């Protein structure tokens, strides 16, 4: 028993129990096209750690044992893993709903030009992070021109049906800088 388990038992008088697994979140690596100051995994373009296909096969084995579970792919920029598309297709073949957490600007990187079409054709759900709704704040946190590229990507995703069709949800995650929310 680890220290966390001991502390939980001291407070609750029993261990933690879980209900059925509904979502499996999988981090495909720390490679990212951005260098965000607020990144909790410290992903950057300089990082080289990525999930291998061998490890992805273990993920597929786990996912197969959990039919109906949503698989949430994250990173870094998960799209930059060279096995990203093969994993998405394998998960869909198993009948899983696939959700990808994207920074939007990755679609402008070399080799990523058709990624939005790839995702839309497969009905992959998207969760897009945008640290603010103001261009200055986004560019300060993520780099010059990131806000404009993000908006361009959102328009492209909308043109493919994302955020417009029930089968192609596009959720935006707002990341405030600090312990506060924007004014109402």
Where are these regions (language model features)?
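Alpha-helix termini
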Residues: 158-165
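Core AdoMet radical
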Residues: 23, 43-51, 66-81, 92-111, ...
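Conserved alpha-helical substructure of the radical SAM core
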Residues: 1-75, 79-96
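Hydrophobic, aromatic-enriched interface-forming segments
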Residues: 167-184
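Short acidic, gly/pro-rich beta-turn/loop elements at beta-sheet edges
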Residues: 36, 110, 138, 180-182
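Amphipathic, soluble alpha/beta structural segments
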Residues: 10, 147, 155-156, 178-181
């Amino acid at each position: 028993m680890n220290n966390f388990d001991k502390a939980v038992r001291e407070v609750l008088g029993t261990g933690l129990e879980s209900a059925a697994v509904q979502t499996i979140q999988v981090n495909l690596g720390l490679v990212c096209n951005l260098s965000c100051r607020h990144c909790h995994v410290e992903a950057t373009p300089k990082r080289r750690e990525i999930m291998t296909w061998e490890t992805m096969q273990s993920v597929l084995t786990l996912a197969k044992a959990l039919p109906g579970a949503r698989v949430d792919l994250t990173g870094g920029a998960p799209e930059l893993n060279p096995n990203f598309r093969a994993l998405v297709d394998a998960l869909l073949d198993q009948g899983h709903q696939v959700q990808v957490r994207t920074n939007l600007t990755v679609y402008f990187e070399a080799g990523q030009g058709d990624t939005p079409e790839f995702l839309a054709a497969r009905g992959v759900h998207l969760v897009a992070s945008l640290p603010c709704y103001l261009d200055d704040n986004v560019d300060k946190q993520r780099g010059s021109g990131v806000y404009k590229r993000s908006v361009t990507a959102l328009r492209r995703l909308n043109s493919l049906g994302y955020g417009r069709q029930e089968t192609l949800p596009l959720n935006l995650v707002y990341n405030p800088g600090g312990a506060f929310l924007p004014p109402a």
